[in-house]
């Protein structure tokens, strides 16, 4: 699969606005003979609610939301790896992360 629109993403992912952090899948490779990978896009605008308090006058996307966007992309990739045989109720959970640091 080469990519996906927001409509195609919503058919696969349970997340919805404001917590769906994928706007487009640019590429998604699930060939079992190769390394599976995904390239996704989130359109971030200055109007995002989290910029109001993080940080006033110096907007920064919170690191935990960046991590969540990565987890959602990984979940989408997992769904594509399962393929058409997946149960429609299948969902991937991000179990956690250790020693994560966010730097500028």
List PLM regions with ranges.
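Helix-adjacent hinge/juxtasegments
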Residues: 55-78, 83-87
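Hydrophobic beta-strand-centered segment that forms part of the acyl-chain substrate-binding groove
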Residues: 1-3, 74-104
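Short coil-to-beta-strand transition motifs
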Residues: 14-21, 91-94
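Short aromatic-glycine motifs in intrinsically disordered, low-complexity regions
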Residues: 4-16, 87-88
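Short amphipathic alpha-helical segments enriched in hydrophobics
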Residues: 13, 29-32, 48, 74, ...
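Generic secondary-structure microfeatures
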Residues: 42-46, 71-74, 101
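Catalytic strand-loop segment that frames the active site of acyl-thioester-processing enzymes
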Residues: 17-61, 66
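Beta-strand-rich interaction surfaces with strong enrichment in secreted/lumenal proteins
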Residues: 10, 57-58, 102-104
């Amino acid at each position: 699969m080469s990519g996906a629109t927001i409509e195609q993403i919503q058919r696969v992912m349970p997340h919805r606005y404001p917590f769906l952090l994928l706007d487009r899948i640019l590429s998604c490779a699930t060939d079992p003979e190769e390394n599976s990978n995904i390239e996704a896009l989130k359109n971030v605008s200055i109007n995002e609610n989290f910029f109001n308090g993080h940080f006033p006058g110096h907007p920064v996307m919170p690191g935990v939301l960046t991590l969540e966007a990565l987890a959602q992309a990984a979940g989408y990739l997992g769904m594509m790896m399962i393929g058409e045989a997946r149960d429609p109720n299948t969902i991937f959970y991000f179990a956690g992360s250790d020693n994560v640091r966010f730097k500028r």
